[in-house]
């Protein structure tokens, strides 16, 4: 499967917003680094703006959506029960399914 191989090739820290395609035979493309350090090839014109929708938010920043997977796994589906805020390495876990998944 091409999708599974592409998911396994790119690191988890750099959200795979675009498929990292191999360098084409023609060198028309412009080689840029898409934030994570590895160069990506854009065979067409200028590269699109960096997509940060699939990036994991850094420590202390709120997740973009409440269903975002925090550092301690996904928040529970029940929004009121299961509060897990015990501080460990990197802060506590999710708080009852709210958006504070990185606290």
Swiss-Prot record:
What ranges does the record give for the region Disordered, renumbered to this chain? 1-103
Record-given protein name:
Uncharacterized protein RPMS1
Compositional bias segments (type: Basic residues): 55-65, 74-84
* Origin: domain of life: Viruses
The species this protein was found in: Epstein-Barr virus (strain B95-8)
Family listed: Belongs to the epstein-barr virus RPMS1 family.
Compositional bias (Low complexity) spans? 35-44
What is the organism lineage in this UniProt record? Viruses, Duplodnaviria, Heunggongvirae, Peploviricota, Herviviricetes
